Amino acid sequence: MIKIAIDAMGGDFAPLEIVKGTLLALNKNTELQVFLYGNQKLITPLIEKTPFFGNKQIIIKHTPYFLGSADKNIRDQLKTTPNTSLFLALEAAKQDEVQGVVSAGATQTLILASHLILKKMPLMKRIAIAPMFNSFDNRTRILLDAGANTELKPQHLHTFANYATIIAKEILAIPNPQIKLLNIGTEPTKGRALELETYQLLSQDSNLNFGGNEEPQNLLTTSADILLSDGFTANIALKTYEGTMLNFMNHLKNILTKNFIKKIATKTLFQKPLQQLKNQIDPRQIGGAMLLGLNKIVIKAHGSSQSYAFCQAILQTQKLIKAQVNQKIANALEIAKNKENQTKKISTSTINPKTSETTKES
């Protein structure tokens, strides 16, 4: 049984859509047990109204406290009000009561709270947000860092590339995932110092399948499985993608249902293809983004998540836990550290033939 903590009070439509999404996930999967952290008086009636068949799979952990969008000083909040729904969910993961956490709360709040409570992996220098997204070619891609760090060093992006590769292999079942660097041109000489130096690091790493630079207009058609950039650039790219896809679907729906005849024709002729198109490009199909680099699996669901999207975020969390992604990243970090230490030893050790010869004669 996989155990997941849910911040029931985080998100634009909490707790209603969070509870509905949780129950939807539980109805789909009997291997899950969830702990809902939030106001029991609000949560219990929602559970009673929703079709649900596994009472032993859900446990409510009552707290009347939660973090709102106006709460900015998370360090102070953690000291003065440690029993908010998010803090308690993360603390449960820290104490090994659960194996993962899902929240649709504010991104920076979740990142900082996760960092303070769960801590980074011992050898991980930065946390990254790694969302996945669908496109017209039925492929799922990973984009990172999508907002955890507005400023990064080339070494950080190099590290992210290695661990996104593990996720692509384990979760997306891609044997040799290709990585590309999001940039303003495809030539190696394009970009800021960050892109230029990162390009060199990725090119020199024989463990990576690096495919060079990728321009933003190819976001949905790129040959890459992983797109890499700093948090500022990648976050803009992600939000542009999400907004474009949702507006496109809404606009198409308005055109095809403008009058009664169009509604009938759409339902008769285009319902199945439109559903296929929606499944291909709807950002809600993925559910959430992993906070890469923490000691436990933490998934950031979209703030505007409704039940289906939140359900997908929970199922994604379960998949990451079952695949033991964190353990594999920790192992990769350890191997990389050992290689680095060996390289340092080789570079610092010097052989002096004369000294060696003198020692032998004496």
UniProtKB/Swiss-Prot annotation:
Keywords: Cytoplasm, Lipid biosynthesis, Lipid metabolism, Phospholipid biosynthesis, Phospholipid metabolism, Transferase. GO terms for molecular function: phosphate:acyl-[acyl carrier protein] acyltransferase activity. SUPFAM superfamilies: Isocitrate/Isopropylmalate dehydrogenase-like. Its EC number is 2.3.1.274. The keyword Membrane does not apply. It is found in: Cytoplasm. One of its GO terms (biological process) is fatty acid biosynthetic process. It catalyses: a fatty acyl-[ACP] + phosphate = an acyl phosphate + holo-[ACP]. Residues 344-356 have a biased composition (Polar residues). GO terms for cellular component: cytoplasm. Pfam families: FA_synthesis. Pathway: Lipid metabolism; phospholipid metabolism. Residues 343-362 are annotated as: Disordered. Homodimer. Probably interacts with PlsY. Catalyzes the reversible formation of acyl-phosphate (acyl-PO(4)) from acyl-[acyl-carrier-protein] (acyl-ACP). This enzyme utilizes acyl-ACP as fatty acyl donor, but not acyl-CoA. Belongs to the PlsX family. This is Phosphate acyltransferase. It comes from Aster yellows witches'-broom phytoplasma (strain AYWB). The lineage of its organism: Bacteria, Bacillati, Mycoplasmatota, Mollicutes, Acholeplasmatales.
